[in-house]
Amino acid sequence: MSEFNRQIPAQSYCGKPWRALAETPGVGGKVLREFEPAANEPCPDDKFLGWLELTPFENEQILRFAEYVLKNENLGHGSATDLLTISLSANDYVGHAFGPYSPEVADTTLRTDRDLRSLGSSGRASERVDCAFG
């Protein structure tokens, strides 16, 4: 896991606007939020991470980490029971920040659904986990 963290996964979102998916009702393709790092400030910093928490990119990062764990940590191959818990909280954070019927919630939900479908090489999270661990 240290290898994953050394990659500084949040850095890939620095300077990247949150642009709604084309299929997001009423706002398809529009920029919903942006974060501009201050000049001469490192990114990611605490301010940026607070911004990231209120975007679907937070869930995307969690699922990238889960994918890393599934591929690299040999879960289910030892004598002890392994447990992988995935908590996708961005939907909750975004809902509280922007309201349950906001375009931000719609876009976050669509992205979370898409990202869950693509988790694992087989294309479906449940199939990937079932194939790997039974």
Segments and roles (model prediction):
Residues 1-80, 89-96:
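His/Asp/Glu-rich, glycine-adjacent segments
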Residues 76, 102, 125-128:
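Helix N-terminus capping/helix-initiation residues
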Residues 96-98, 117:
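Extended acidic, low-complexity intrinsically disordered regions
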Residues 111-134:
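Metal-dependent active-site segment of extracytoplasmic phospho-/sulfohydrolases and closely related
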